[in-house]
């Protein structure tokens, strides 16, 4: 899609058949990275060609398992995930509330705790599409939207965050992980997004982990 670029993939160690990647948002004369993954260094030259990256925006601390990229870029994560992140990856700044990245008001930071305490979703308006970077909070498996409720996840927070995401205006869901060989994003209408998130809310409220 215009303005959105995906890095090469890397396997998710604890979930066979699932890969992760980072995304590059071309925003004027600079670029912004979403999600940490080995793909950043694999595509370092291509990323620089799109404009020197201003930030690496991390959805949650699990992304730190791959360590810091060699590409020099300030890493930001939510304050509530900072301690876990810094065990593996230096943090240059934190989010604490809903707000914007940069002056153009095109990239919004939206805390959506649940999967971890500091999960942060990013909503980007490219001018042509509205992308929701949902991390692991919502991903696609077998063509179906799913959640990832872990043993240490907060189910009540997760439900509140799903309700918040249901009201966001977006047309492209972009998770961190995807099945190997499957598309890395899902294009939907606003009605479809609401319907699918309603189904997630129902399942999580009933005790489902996915």
Regions found by a protein language model. Give the residues of each.
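Residues that act as N-cap/strand-start positions at coil-to-secondary-structure junctions
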Residues: 17-19, 95, 116-118
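Active-site HxH/HxHxD metal-binding segment of metal-dependent hydrolases
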Residues: 38-103, 192-203
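Short gly/ser/thr-rich secondary-structure transition/capping motifs
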Residues: 14-16, 38, 92-94, 155-156
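Metallo-beta-lactamase
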Residues: 2, 6-9, 14-15, 30-33, ...
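Short, surface-exposed beta-strand/loop micro-motifs that present aromatic residues
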Residues: 22-26
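Short, solvent-exposed coil/turn segments
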Residues: 18, 102-105
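Short N-terminal binding/cap micro-motifs at the start of the first secondary-structure element
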Residues: 14-20, 42-43
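Conserved beta-strand-loop surface patch within small alpha/beta domains used
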Residues: 27, 36-39
């Amino acid at each position: 899609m215009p303005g959105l670029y995906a890095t090469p993939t890397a396997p998710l160690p604890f979930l066979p058949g699932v890969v992760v990647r980072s995304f590059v948002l071309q925003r004027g004369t600079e670029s912004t990275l979403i999600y940490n993954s080995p793909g950043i260094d694999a595509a370092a030259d291509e990323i620089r060609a799109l404009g020197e990256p201003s930030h690496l925006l991390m959805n949650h601390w699990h992304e730190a398992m791959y360590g810091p990229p060699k590409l020099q870029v300030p890493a930001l994560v939510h304050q509530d995930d900072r301690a876990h992140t810094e065990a593996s990856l230096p943090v240059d700044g934190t989010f604490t509330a809903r707000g914007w990245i940069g002056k153009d008001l095109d990239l919004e930071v939206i805390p959506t705790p649940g999967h971890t305490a500091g999960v942060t979703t990013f909503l980007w308006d490219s001018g042509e599409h509205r992308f929701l970077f949902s991390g692991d909070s919502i991903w696609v498996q077998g063509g179906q939207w799913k959640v990832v409720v872990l043993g240490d996840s907060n189910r009540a927070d997760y439900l509140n965050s799903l309700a918040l995401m249901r009201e966001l205006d977006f047309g492209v869901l972009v998770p961190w992980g995807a099945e190997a060989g499957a598309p890395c994003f899902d294009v939907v209408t606003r009605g479809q997004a609401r319907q699918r998130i309603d189904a997630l809310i129902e399942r999580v409220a009933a005790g489902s982990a996915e």
